[in-house]
Each structure stands twice: as C-alpha cells, then as structure tokens.
Swiss-Prot record:
The keyword Transport does not apply. It is an enzyme of class 3 (hydrolase). The active site is at 111 (nucleophile), 136. One of its GO terms (molecular function) is serine-type endopeptidase activity. Gene3D superfamilies: 2-enoyl-CoA Hydratase, Chain A, domain 1 (3.90.226.10). The gene is clpP. InterPro entries: ClpP, ClpP/crotonase-like_dom_sf, ClpP/TepA, ClpP_His_AS, ClpP_Ser_AS. PROSITE patterns: CLP_PROTEASE_HIS (PS00382), CLP_PROTEASE_SER (PS00381). It comes from Psychromonas ingrahamii (strain DSM 17664 / CCUG 51855 / 37). Cleaves peptides in various proteins in a process that requires ATP hydrolysis. Has a chymotrypsin-like activity. Plays a major role in the degradation of misfolded proteins. This is ATP-dependent Clp protease proteolytic subunit. It is found in: Cytoplasm. One of its GO terms (cellular component) is cytoplasm. The keyword NADP does not apply.
Amino acid sequence: MSNPFAGNTDPISNALIPMVVEQTAKGERSYDIYSRLLKERVIFLTGPVEDHVANVIAAQLLFLESESPEKDIFIYINSPGGSISAGMAIYDTMQFIKPDVSTVCMGMAASMGAFLLASGAPGKRHCLPNAKVMIHQPLGGFQGQASDFEIHAKEILATKHRMNELLAFHTGKDIEIIAQDTDRDNFMRASEAVEYGIVDSVLTHRK
C-alpha cells in the first residue's frame, strides 16, 4: 500500500511521519502511519486542497471501495480549503462510490474543507469539540485581456451558484440563506456547525 504522502520531498516533514512495525507470518512489515490507517479505512485531508491531494484521496476512495464496497470510509479533515476543481474531484468521488463516507472535522475545515465536511453521508458527519468551520463564497482571481474578464466573471458566478445549491442540499438550508451566509467569511464553532446542518454531531469520546 503506497504512502499517500509520497510526493512530499520535504525531509523535515517526512522525518515527522511515524512508522508502524507489525509482525506478520513472513516477518516484520513497516508502514508509515497514514498507510497503516488506510488499512482501517481512514483517510486524512490535511492542508490545502490541491490537484495532487485530490488525486491521492480519490484513488484512496476508489481503492477502499474495491476492497469492501459495504464498509464505511472515514475522512478526517483539517484544511484551510483550496482549489475548487480539486475539491469537486474529491466531492464527486465521494458521491460516486458505494460505501458511505463519514467526515470528521479536527482543527479547522474552511472553505472547500467545510464543503467536503458537509458532503459526508447523512448522519455520519462530525466535528471534534474544539474544531471550527468556516464557509464563504468562492474566491477568484484573473490576469489577462480585458475581453476575457467577463467570461471569467460569469464562470465564477456560475460556480458560486452551483456550490450554494450543493451546500443547501447537504445542510437542508434554503439557497437564499446559503448565499447570504457565505457572502463573507462565516466562522462557526462545532455546536454551531451542528445547528447549521454542516455536521450531524460533536464527538467528544469514541463509543
């Protein structure tokens, strides 16, 4: 099972990833901690949502589906958000596969991180007690010819509307309320995220 952080060439970051050694019939086998947790159907979304992160998470989701289509998958999220297209690649894969995907926010789920948190299976979306959630409208920047600005402005507005539609679906809120509440950065504590419908419960202890 490959290391989901294999693309990280930072020696300091790599040195901080613990290794787990297991005894097998064929002798010792070592895993980095993330690969070992993947065997337990646990995926981590940490840091910015970027294309290479989305590719790894989508691959992990598809792999776990092929292993056991009936067993839940768990995604732990601690992310400031990031690329909309990368986030939508993760979102679409979560909705496409057969297993329920349970989402858990630890630390912070902001922007696309909050969107993915809300898109977990109904009844299986959670926050840890001191986690925070932040929602806002998509951010866009463009440099180029003046004639192209209108094209990109229309695309940003269309993306904003689509994400508001999906967030309204997953939270049960009216789209008008979502549009109003995401007009500026909107921070929520764990209990407020439950009230808003982004998550279903706050987890304090494992049952």
